[in-house]
């Protein structure tokens, strides 16, 4: 369900951006109306290619209306999808702002970092810390702490944006080099620290490193989104055109 919601959020985001360009939106509506009219004409008359005597019924008129509406919606979506990259980047920015304000997530990732570092058994947890964190004096601890925050931040993005994440990374799993790159930068940033800082700061650093990678992958959103909508349009249009064509063919058999 989240996958569909994430896709629809990109769809609506793209439409909103399109409406922010009044002239382009107006031209799009004109083209959509024209093509929708052609869609009506095509659905109502294409069956006469093999059955000149066929007359559409009220049911067929409804199917023609469906084909018309689908054509109109398709044109608007297809044009608006030129802005899906911009919509995706807005989603990435919103995610980046939201993740550092999600107290439940920050608490869970801090606890996970504490547990993972403590499991290593190489730090003295009896020492007091200045920021209420946990000791990360050893290189192994720094690496483990960075891995926890990097992977947790990525998992948060994947959970909240399942559709977008599949496009950004184009694989079932996040490329290992992406994780390693974030880990390396976190370690570099905290190399002079002897303890963990508040989870919000560490997550923010992971977000800052991850956002450019996400924006880079977001370039693929436009062709993929348009490919999906074209495939859906053709698939769904088979219903009205197929039913009308089948009715005309059946009527031809009865007449003969």
Regions found by a protein language model. Name each.
Residues 2-50:
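Membrane-embedded alpha-helical segments of integral membrane proteins
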Residues 3-22, 97-108, 133, 184, ...:
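Aromatic-enriched hydrophobic runs in primary sequence
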Residues 8-22, 195-235:
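Short, aromatic-rich amphipathic segments at membrane interfaces
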Residues 34-67, 222-256:
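Juxtamembrane interface at the cytosolic side of transmembrane helices
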Residues 44-46, 70-101:
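Transmembrane signal-anchor/signal-peptide helices with a preference for the extracytoplasmic
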Residues 61-71, 181-182, 186, 190:
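Membrane-embedded hydrophobic alpha-helical segments
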Residues 93-213:
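Long, solvent-exposed extracytoplasmic domains/loops
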